[in-house]
Amino acid sequence: MKTLFIDRDGTINKDCPYCHNPSDLFIYPDAVDLLQRYQDDGFRIIIVTNQSGIGRGYFTESQFKEFSDFMNDKLKENGIVISAIYYCPHKPEDSCNCRKPETGLFSEVLEDYKVDIPSSIVVGDRNEIDGEFARRIKLPFRLLRH
């Protein structure tokens, strides 16, 4: 299935320092429009996000999941279904293979889903991270800034 791989903080929601509190959630209206258009065009929506706040001890995986569930509920109110969220909990200096722009999260998705790679796309707010991730997995990239 064609898939939209989309970043979270700064792309779907306003980036706050280590977002993890549901009361801090602000979803960009243009991101909702974009997600709706891709979903209407038959794309599966998967979030791929770096969450170094977990590795730094600023918040727990449980808090991350609570924030994610809250965001997903808000998106569902707009008819948007997020199929999955893949995240890297590591700090940049941990040199893992899952922190974007590394491709480990993409490999995880491919283990779990059948992806029509030629028809898929990456959307994010940072060319040096999300764009480089897209280039490494050989997918087109769309920059979304608010």
UniProtKB/Swiss-Prot annotation:
Site for Contributes to substrate recognition, residues: R99
Residues noted as binding Zn(2+) in the record, renumbered to the chain: C88, H90, C96, C98
GO biological process, one term: carbohydrate metabolic process
EC annotation from Swiss-Prot or TrEMBL: 3.1.3.-
Record localization: Cytoplasm
Active-site positions on this chain: D7, D9
InterPro entries hit by this protein: HAD-like_sf, HAD-SF_hydro_IIIA, HAD_sf, Heptose_bisP_phosphatase, Histidinol-phos, PNK3P
Chemical reaction(s) catalysed: D-glycero-D-manno-heptose 1,7-bisphosphate + H2O = D-glycero-D-manno-heptose 1-phosphate + phosphate
Cofactor requirement: Mg(2+); Zn(2+)
Residues noted as binding substrate in the record, renumbered to the chain: D7, R8, D9, D15, C16, P17, Y18, T49, N50, Q51, S52, R99, K100
Positions bearing the site annotation: Stabilizes the phosphoryl group: T49, K100
Gene Ontology molecular function, alphabetical: D-glycero-beta-D-manno-heptose 1,7-bisphosphate 7-phosphatase activity; magnesium ion binding; zinc ion binding
Similarity comment: family membership: Belongs to the GmhB family.
PANTHER family, per database record: D-GLYCERO-BETA-D-MANNO-HEPTOSE-1,7-BISPHOSPHATE 7-PHOSPHATASE (PTHR42891:SF1)
Stated name of the protein: Probable D-glycero-D-manno-heptose-1,7-bisphosphate 7-phosphatase
Originating species: Thermoplasma volcanium (strain ATCC 51530 / DSM 4299 / JCM 9571 / NBRC 15438 / GSS1)
